[in-house]
Amino acid sequence: MNTNIIPRPEHPQPIMKRENWQNLNGEWLFEFDFGVSGEERGLYKPEKASEYSKKITVPFCPESGLSGINYKDFIPAVWYKRTVSITKEQLENRVLLHFGAVDYACTVYVNGNKAGCHFGGYSSFVLDITDLLKIGENDLTVNARDNVRSGNQPKGKQAGLFYSSGCDYTRTTGIWQTVWLEFVPSGYIKTAKYYPDIENGSFDIELNVTRGGRLTAEAFFDGRAVGSATKEIKGRYARFTLPLAEKHLWDLGCGNLYDLKFTLETDGGTDILSSYAGLREVRIDGFKVLINGKSVFQRTVLDQGFYPDGIYTAPSDEALKRDIELSMQLGFNGARLHEKMFEPRFLYHCDKAGYLVWGEHANWGLDINRESSLLNFLPEWSETVERDFNHPSIIGWCPFNETWDQTSQAAHRILRAVYDETKRLDPTRPVIDVSGAYHEITDIYDQHDYDQNPESFGKSYAGYNGEEESFNLFFKDKQVYIPQLPFFLSEFGGIKWIPESNRCSAADNSWGYGDAPATEEEFFTRYEGLTAALLNAPNIMGFCYTQLYDVEQEVNGLYTCAREKKFADYSRIIAANRKKAAIEE
């Protein structure tokens, strides 16, 4: 196989980076398993390579054009296979096999032996495969099983019908993020967690290691050494403070980051881990959400993380950065990452840009009226919160979105349990239990409102005093208003707009919210009126406009699905977004 061409060659997790790693993206053998019989047929065995009839480009899913497969129907199971060459020197270390994400249930084999399993299509996982390897060529096989119609797994916006329709889109099966090897000594750092202290200018750091030893932590800013600490670790856990000689806060549009270097010396070798962190605090004060002690109106935009050619996977690192740049150019200061846990590389670019984001799970497709749903949801959600904890760009968590099907006491208990666990894992950020729907227990009250009339929309929010609801609810019998909390209109707008030059070729099933404006002038007037109503309300702390770009048949983006301009001049949108908010005064 030609493994010289490596798509997405950049390191997938710059916040946990070692120099000694190997990217496994590129060409793999591939086979559909429509009968889910591949294990019985022994497709995991090295000698079965000849039974793989196709080749796929990893990390792109088989539904995507970039994968080389481009198969759009339902896929219950798939198999991947490739060989990996391992040297004697590499086997003197521990060899870790990382998967950015595999949708949904994954089993990994090395040289015909089961290396491990993982459930969850959005969280990352790692396997120590050292003891299954040999010097020379090794067979690596991956099996993924996926059933978006089951009601037992989160699927996000992946369509449960054959065709994409409404706000459901093309499905993703199997590997959709980078696969890589990492070579570490037997004594190495497994996890790291940073708690910024903006008052004292320091980081409180928690580390989990495989064995005790001497740890040195160093901090740098713009290449200058600005802090260090040493710690003798007796067991497998350490907590210590890393003081900083210079204080540079991470802030909106100013992604100040400290480069961190950890050196762990043990009798099992020396491990060097590169990372970074930002000095940033999120705090609630009445109806305000404070970033570093300052009231910030969150001018966010909905970003669903879909790409025409890669589906869930960006075609390049530049494409990830481009979405952030397009948003900030329009005057947004952040995004609600919607019904998808985005890859860490995207969060890295958010960190660098000073771009606020909300982390949200892809809960759609999971029937939360079943108590068993908690078993399929919570481990994956917890893994992702732990993985992304150190990103300063994430200023809040939202595990669920619009759980309109909540009808049982089991659902209420699940929502509360997930909120409680999220707060246990991360006490430093606010948590919205369910965006736009039932609020069982939440730090911020949020709502979705797609009223397209600026006048009635404005009347709903102008008099909002935080004491009683004055706004529209989709389903009054299914939603609970909670007073005395910060108010976030986390979905609004969604104005359908197809440029006049494209209207003759627009899909018949294209849609947006409400009636589409007849002219650009009408679009801009509506946009200005809707945003002004929220910016002028003294007790509203933020909005999220739907959405940054079109996604397949949903044409309410400010750009097309290919990220092309819909308008020749965006100046009125930019001016509307940048207007000062009442709550910022």
Segments the model singles out, each with a brief description of its role:
Residues A115-G116, V226, V296:
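Short hydrophobic beta-strand segments in globular cytosolic domains
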Residues M1-L66, N143, N147-N152, D222-R224, ...:
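Accessory carbohydrate-binding/adhesion or oligomerization-edge regions at the termini
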Residues Y163-T172, S186-K193, R280-K294:
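Low-complexity, Pro/Ser/Thr- and charge-rich linker/hinge segments at domain boundaries
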Residues E10, P14-I15, N20, L29-G35, ...:
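Accessory beta-strand-rich segments of carbohydrate-active enzymes
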Residues D204, I324-E325, G334-E564, I583:
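Substrate-binding/catalytic cleft of secreted carbohydrate-active enzymes
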Residues W28, G112, V179, Y258, ...:
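Conserved, mostly hydrophobic/aromatic
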Residues V110, S202-K231, A238-F240:
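Beta-strand-rich binding/interaction modules
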Residues K261-S327:
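N-terminal carbohydrate-binding accessory modules
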